[in-house]
Each structure stands twice: as structure tokens, then as C-alpha cells.
Amino acid sequence: MTQTPEALTTEQFKQAIIDKGQYYHIYHPFHVMMYEGKATQQQIQAWVANRYYYQINIPLKDAAIMANCPDQRVRQEWIQRMIDQDGEYPDGGGREAWLRLAEAVGLSREQVISEELVLPGVRFAVDAYVNFARRASWREAASSSLTELFAPQIHQSRLESWPQHYPWIDDKGYEYFRSRLSQARRDVEHGLTITLDSFTTHEQQQRMLEILQFKLDILWSILDALTLAYVHNEAPYHSVTQERVWHKGLFK
């Protein structure tokens, strides 16, 4: 009879989660290029415009988690994530802060909101994340958010390197990164508690680690799409036309 592998201890499981940080998109060549001051203004703008699509879908992901969660106490805490991103009327929250970043790098908010610059590969990756959150159990979807463990480092890196390398970016554009330093740490504490309490068998823990890898794949794939289009100059249909003929989103 095959013996069932033993579950990791809480500390071992936590360390296995932390070890996934080696695959975080902070190490993607596109991010490294931005940190090292080697990105052009067009490349910075492309990242901001495409990342906007990720930003506006995060509240939809969080809404899906809450819709699937019967635990009132969890919902009471999780809803703060939606408020952080969407704000409380009339404040625009993280979404508005991101649009100010877009303006700071030389984009118009109208162009960013139109999503005309969002690459199909970016759209597909983000949509896959939202659809996963809708279909998965709330505990699994919540655990996918644990890439936030590594987020403070990435925000701090931008705050330290961008002003030095890109003095043409207006300082007001950095508000989003500053706000996320504390918000991400708070969110991690809640998400990590849920995860460590929810996944207690070997099989459950391995599935959770695979879910976390799925989320890391999404973040990495977003940058792969940007690299192809804005580093190698091979945007979709580049061999046919230089126009942005790809679809701009079917459900808006």
C-alpha cells in the first residue's frame, strides 16, 4: 500500500510559499530593465497602460472571492481590498492613483481607460485570473493573492530607482506605489492566515502551491507579452500591419 505523504508543518508550508518568491515578476527582464533605468518612455508607458487592465480587474477578482465565501468575518476583512482599489465615492482609490501615474508618464487618462493599448496576451492573462477566482473555492482563490508577499519589495524598488533614472516622471505618479507598501503587508497577513489554516494535508498544500505558481505564471506572462511587443518590436500582427487591430475587450 502506498503511504500518503505527510503534510508539511505550518512553518515548512509557510517557507514553501515564501520560496515561490524566486519566480516573482520582479526578476523578469522587463522589470529589471525598468529598475536599471534602461527602459524608454514608450516602454514605461506601455507597462503602465497594460498594467491598468490588471489593476481594474483586481476588485472583480476580490468580489468573486467574497461572492463565494460564506464566512462573514472573512468578507468583512476582504472587502477592504476592494475599497483600496476602487475607493469610496467620490475618492477613486488605487484606480485613480494609477491613472495619475499614467498622466505622470505622459499618457492621457482617456487613452488608458479606453484600453486601446492593452495587448491581447495581457488581457488573456488577467481574464484567466478573474475567471479562476470565480470558479475556484474562495479559499483557493484567496490563496492565489499571496504573491502580495513579495509586493512590498517591488513597490520599494520602483520608488528607489524610478525617480533616479526617469526624472521626467512627475512625483505625484508614485502615490500608488507608496500606498501599497502598507496595504500589501496588511493583506498578506490576512491571506496567509487563511491559507495556513485552510490547507493542512499534503495534497491540499501541493495544490495551493500549484495555484500560487499559476498566479506567478500570470504575472510573468504579462511581461512576456510586453517584451515581445515593446522590446523585440513584435506586437500582434506585426508581420501584417503596424496598426493595433487586436480586439479591445468584448465585455466592458
Swiss-Prot record:
Pathway: Cofactor biosynthesis; pyrroloquinoline quinone biosynthesis. The keyword Cell inner membrane does not apply. GO terms for molecular function: pyrroloquinoline-quinone synthase activity. It comes from the Bacteria. It catalyses: 6-(2-amino-2-carboxyethyl)-7,8-dioxo-1,2,3,4,7,8-hexahydroquinoline-2,4-dicarboxylate + 3 O2 = pyrroloquinoline quinone + 2 H2O2 + 2 H2O + H(+). The keyword Oxidoreductase applies. Keywords: Oxidoreductase, PQQ biosynthesis. It is an enzyme of class 1 (oxidoreductase). Disulfide bonds: none annotated. Transmembrane segments: none annotated. Its EC number is 1.3.3.11. GO terms for biological process: pyrroloquinoline quinone biosynthetic process; sulfur compound metabolic process. Ring cyclization and eight-electron oxidation of 3a-(2-amino-2-carboxyethyl)-4,5-dioxo-4,5,6,7,8,9-hexahydroquinoline-7,9-dicarboxylic-acid to PQQ. Belongs to the PqqC family. This is Pyrroloquinoline-quinone synthase.
